[in-house]
Amino acid sequence: KRYDTCVKLKNAPIKCSWTNLGLLDDIRALKMSSNTYQFYTAFKVANTAYYYDMPFAILNNAFEIYRNTFAEFGLGVKTGIDLPNESTGLKGKNDTSGLLLDFAIGQYDNYTPLQLAQYISTIANNGSRMKLHLLKEVYSYESQLQKLIYQNKIEELNKLNTDSQYLNRVQEGLKAVMSYGGTGSGYIDKNYLPAGKTGTSQSFVDTNGDGLVDTETVSNTFAGYAPYDDPKATFTVVSPDTYNYQTTYQSYVNKRITQRISQKYFEIYG
């Protein structure tokens, strides 16, 4: 456990969580979306002992360690979906030390909604990353008889290279996110036993048409699954530019979309 204390590196602004979250373990850090818990994890990955206002120089391949791990979940790599082309996202070009902290909280490399869907499905599937498909089956109807003429086969791309006890902790953390007081509370009806994770990232848009992408906004994401004890479906919602720092209006569209699509899914499929 550790307290949710801010981090200060030499010649860099102080970095904190969205509020002071008090004493944290890994479950509560996920539930409350702690930035600083991830910062200290990044220091461990970089084999660095943190102290206030320290110079930070990465002496190992910390970025590569993160990216290789994320790739096992489907982040930064192709999902294998049955489309002629797909993006692998956007990889940050500068691996300077301070950016590792941004990377650790999802504020550096960029991923597609499909990759987020595969990532959360991998967790729901207990570490099995499955190939994505838009098409499941094709049937023909002849003389009122139904005949299967094509079927996409279930294909496992890889298994997570981690001990099941650590994946279990992540799953417990995602359940906590959706519980009372968690950042995902209310996104999916609690009766469906959801697990998931909210995300908030800084983004920029051109608001006055001058060709400069210089207005800071916030984009929201959600990835989750239900029920957590026997997952039937995963849900991924990405809502860009939902909040503009120049206004007092804040949109909860990401939450509303998640509520509606999850509710409709379980109404139809049970």
What residue ranges belong to the model's regions?
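Beta-lactam-recognizing serine transpeptidase/beta-lactamase-like catalytic domain environment
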Residues: K1-S239
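Glycine-rich loops and low-complexity Gly/Arg-rich segments
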Residues: M54-P55, R129-M130, T247-Q250, R260-K264
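Short, gly/Ser/Thr-rich active-site loops of penicillin-recognizing serine hydrolases
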Residues: L145-I149, I154, Y252-G270
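Membrane-interface anchoring segments and C-terminal beta-barrel signals
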Residues: N220-G224, P231-A233, Y243-N244, I257-I268
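A short acidic/glycine-rich loop-to-helix N-cap element
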Residues: D241-N254
